[in-house]
UniProtKB/Swiss-Prot annotation:
The keyword Membrane applies. The lineage of its organism: Bacteria, Bacillati, Actinomycetota, Actinomycetes, Mycobacteriales. Induction: Expression is regulated by ClgR. Disruption phenotype: The Rv2743c-Rv2742c double mutation reduces intracellular ATP levels under surface-stress conditions to less than 60% of wild-type levels. Inactivation of Rv2743c reduces mprA and sigB expression to 20% and 10% of wild-type levels, respectively, after treatment with SDS. Inactivation increases M.tuberculosis susceptibility to the intramacrophage environment. This is Putative envelope-preserving system protein Rv2743c. It is a multi-pass membrane protein. GO terms for cellular component: membrane. It comes from Mycobacterium tuberculosis (strain ATCC 25618 / H37Rv). The chain crosses the membrane at residues 50-72, 77-99. It is found in: Membrane. It comes from the Bacteria. The keyword Transcription regulation does not apply. Keywords: Membrane, Stress response, Transmembrane, Transmembrane helix. Involved in preservation of envelope integrity and tolerance to surface stress. Reverses the inhibitory effect of PspA on ClgR activity. Facilitates intracellular growth of M.tuberculosis.
Length: 270
C-alpha cells in the first residue's frame, strides 16, 4: 500500500503542475483582455497613437518643405517645386488634425485606474474562494460606479482618488489574506498533524475575509445610492449630501478594517 501511495504521488504532482500551468495561461489571457477593454488604457493608447502619427506627419511636412525650399534656392523646375510643395501641404493637413486630436484627448480626464491585473481565484474547495469571488464582483461594480461619478463630476478629484486608494488597499489586504489561507490549506493537506493547529487560524482568516467583503459591499451600496440620487429628479440636495456622507463613512470603516487587520498581524510584512 505504501508503494502504491508513493506511485500515485508523482501523478498527483504532475496533475497539479498541469492545473497550475493552465491557470497561468488563463490568467495571462484574462489580463490581456482586461488591458484591451480598460477605458483608462484605451484612452492612453488613443493619446499615444494621435501624438505618434501627428509627429510623423509633422516631420514629413518639415522634410518636404525643406526640400522644396532647397530646390527653389537652386533654381529647379517649377513643376518639381509644385510637386514637393503639394506633398508638404498634404502632410501638413493630417499633422494638424492629429495634433489637435491629441490636444483634445489630453483635455479629457483619465478614467479611474482599475485593479492592475486579473487575479486568480483560490482553488475550488478553498475556504477563501467564495469571499474572493464576491470581492471580484464588488470590485467591478465599484470601479464602474467610480467612472460614472468621475464623468459626472459628482465628487471632487481628491475624493475620487481617496476612494480608489481605499479600494486598492482593501483588495491588497484581502488578496494577501487569501494567499495565506491557501498556503495553510496546502500545509494541512500535506501534514495531517498540523490540522489541529492550522484549522482555527484558517477559520479566523476566512471570517476576516467575510468581514472585508461585507465592508466593501457597504461602500459599493453607498456609491450606488450616491449615483442614483445625483441622477434623480432632485439633483444636488440634502439626499445627495447624505449619501455622500454615508459613502465617506463606509470608506473610513473599510480602511480602518484593513489597517487594523494589518496591525494585528493578519498580513505579511513587506
Amino acid at each position: 500500500m505504501a508503494v502504491k501511495a508513493g506511485q500515485r504521488r508523482p501523478w498527483r504532482s504532475l496533475l497539479q503542475r498541469g492545473v497550475d500551468t493552465a491557470g497561468d495561461l488563463a490568467d495571462l489571457v484574462a489580463q490581456k483582455i482586461s488591458v484591451a477593454i480598460d477605458p483608462r488604457a484605451r484612452l492612453l493608447r488613443r493619446r499615444r497613437r494621435a501624438l505618434r502619427w501627428g509627429l510623423v506627419f509633422t516631420a514629413g511636412c518639415l522634410l518636404w518643405g525643406l526640400v522644396t525650399a532647397l530646390l527653389a534656392a537652386w533654381g529647379w523646375f517649377t513643376s518639381l517645386l509644385v510637386i514637393t510643395g503639394t506633398i508638404a501641404v498634404t502632410q501638413a493637413i493630417p499633422a494638424t488634425l492629429l495634433l489637435l486630436r491629441y490636444r483634445w484627448l489630453r483635455s479629457e480626464p483619465l478614467p479611474v485606474r482599475r485593479p492592475a491585473s486579473v487575479r486568480r481565484l483560490p482553488p475550488p474547495g478553498s475556504a477563501a474562494r467564495p469571499a474572493m469571488s464576491a470581492l471580484g464582483a464588488s470590485e467591478r461594480g465599484f470601479f464602474s460606479l467610480l467612472g460614472v461619478m468621475e464623468r459626472g463630476a459628482m465628487l471632487p478629484a481628491d475624493e475620487i482618488r481617496d476612494l480608489t486608494a481605499a479600494a486598492n488597499q482593501t483588495s491588497a489586504a484581502m488578496v494577501a489574506t487569501a494567499a495565506e489561507v491557501v498556503s495553510m490549506e496546502r500545509a494541512v493537506q500535506c501534514s495531517a498533524a498540523s490540522r489541529s493547529y492550522l484549522v482555527p487560524t484558517i477559520n479566523a482568516f476566512t471570517a476576516q475575509l467575510s468581514t472585508g467583503v461585507r465592508q466593501y459591499n457597504e461602500m459599493v451600496t453607498a456609491a450606488a445610492q450616491l449615483v442614483s440620487s445625483a441622477n434623480g429628479a432632485g439633483g444636488a440636495g440634502p439626499g445627495q449630501q447624505r449619501y455622500r456622507e454615508e459613502l465617506a463613512g463606509a470608506t473610513d470603516r473599510l480602511v480602518a478594517w484593513a489597517q487594523a487587520f494589518d496591525e494585528l498581524g493578519g498580513l505579511p510584512r513587506r
